Amino acid sequence: MAGKLSIIPLGGLGEIGKNMMALAYGDDIIVIDAGLMFPDAEMLGADFLIPDIGYLLKRRRNIRGMLITHGHEDHIGALPYLLPQLDCPVYAARLTAKLLSVELRQRGMKGKPKLHIVSTGEKVALGSFTVEFFPVCHSIPDATGLIIDTPLGIVVHSGDFKIDYTPIIDAPTDLSRLSQLGGKGVLLLLSDSTYVELSGYTPSEKVVGDVLDNIIAGASGRVLSLIHI
């Protein structure tokens, strides 16, 4: 008799920030991302918010690994506060792992994290799960989605992504790999849905780059640019 696959959202649904989710099958748990959320104007005295990991703390011995999709704060920012409590291995692409190492050091985390760098296309066996990282296009290099092979079927976690055929950095989202999975059959798709309620599509980053080039070229004085990571 087949077991039960549980999807446990710990943050990030219906909100921007605190992205964190767990998948459980039998005695095995994997965790995807661990982000923070910045407070709104009504949350006086709060510097940031992190997910409630009570579910995981009760089952910390069952956690086989934590998978990080990319290096934005809403996906890695809570790790300095949660990882010492969970003490589990962390898997991420190279740039994401480097950003996470800096984050952990700056926040004063004691001890050496069990941090593993994973290449896209590489598969990681974690208990009942086998996870493959695949490239997606996002506003930061080395962004990835996850193909999670479970005893009940394939779960695809998109990570944060956009469809951009002419990205300025990194490669486009690997639609051919997703097409292959579609042909095999996918049990569940967990997809980024930011601004999905709006009609139309998001233009390429190249269009934005061309506009910025024109603005900067026409500026008569010093140009200051504010960016985020």
Task: Annotate each language-model stretch with its function.
Residues A2-L67, H72-I227:
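His/Asp/Glu-rich metal-coordinating catalytic cores
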